Amino acid sequence: MATITREQIGSLHDKITVQMVKEDYVPGFEKAMKGYAKTVQVPGFRKGMVPAGMVKKMYGPSIFNEEIIRTASKELETYLQKENLAIFAQPLMMPNESNYQLDMNNPQDVSFSFEVGLKPTFDIKPIQDKAKLTRYSIEVADTMIADELVRLQRRYGKAEPQETVVNADDIIYATYHKCDATGAVVDANAKQEDTVLFDKLPKGMQTLLMGKKAEDTFTIVPNQVCGADELTAFLKDPLKTTETDAATTYQVTLTKVARLIPRDLDETLYAEVFPNAAITTLDAFKEKLKEELGKEFVRISKERLTNEMYELLVHQTKLDLPVAFLKRWMKEGQEKVRTDEEVEAEFGSFDHQLRWTLISDKLIVENKIQVNLDDVKNSLKAQVMSYFGMGADDEAPWMDGYMDKIMKDEKTIDETYRKMLFDRLFEYLETQFTIQDKKVSEEEFFKLQDPHATHHHH
């Protein structure tokens, strides 16, 4: 029977040695050889009739090696289960640790050494201390409602053809061709097309376009028509290029001009924006806009609070990790072998995510946070009904068949399950912190420091 010893070689980092006498693995090797001889196919021999000596000579060394490794791995697995060791990933064979020569004709006592990374035990101090967090309530200002009215009037407006570019509400349809040093078009077929509101163009382009008619052609140089704060965006879209073409000449053809005629604020617009709400007055429309903007702000605020809790737990929960083992596992223990430089570059984000996995797993288990298959199905059904604009009382004969099809999609089920599980985890966490409510304006909210930067101290 194998002898197993364990010694600490670092923080949460142990070396486990499996020592085997030949009697531990030779019977398994002989059994494997007999089984292989029954199935191996060699030209000139019937299946199962290949001489044992030939099979051993041809395939014995590889089967011998496999059986020794298999036996050692099985002994190690049994030991880990018996000792109830919680380890990261899987054991890694120690480099340059072999002290034997594998020879099937001369079996010897052998030993293998593995290194393992142990999962830490830890307390979640931010929860124990009822750490303080802020939940922000973003106010929907009257100016926001006014801006939203203008945006919707323009969005649902119509474009009327015009002869000449004359104001900021004009819609510009244009094509761009790159030119060579002489000003000639490089490739007539290589063009970029763009449709944009006049007032969204760089100021220099606006000056050139004013008064132009459809089919007019002129040339521009991006860094001459763009300010420093406009250049990068203009090169990216519409020109689909980079800073290397900042001084390149482009031929611009104004293919069409149209005028954006904003929609009137009336019942037809209200019905298009909110088809399921019977809105007849401007005041009611404004109230509905305020309600919808409020919902979006609640979502954004909740998302920030979730990020705050996540970052606080990751950065303020003290837990040790077997860094040396984890880096070696990242380098050698996966399908993709990484360089030392790649490991160092990726370790920060890996460490961050691993800490969250340990913390969230502990919280989910200890607080019995669960999601069952019916929960997943009901959530997906609600999403389907929302997508089709259905109410709870609406009948849909096709729904059962549609849901059966969705419930066979393992990826969708897994994604929904994980989202619901973590939603419930964060709902629970909201009850475990000291949360203060604070009203802020939209501008104040978006000036707040990023949660990661706030809590990142290690």
Which residue stretches match the model-derived regions?
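Extended, domain-scale alpha-helical bundle/helix-rich regions
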Residues: F64, R70-F122
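Phosphate-interacting basic helix/loop segments used at nucleotide- and nucleic-acid interfaces
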Residues: I87-N99, L149-D169, D409
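Internal alpha/beta scaffold segment
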Residues: G117-G157
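Generic structural signal for buried aliphatic residues
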Residues: V110, I172, F218-I220, T248
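Extended, charged alpha-helical "arm"/coiled-coil substrate-binding scaffolds
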Residues: A2-T71, T78-Y79, K178, G211, ...
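Core FKBP-type peptidyl-prolyl cis-trans isomerase
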Residues: A32, L149, E160-K212, V221-P222, ...
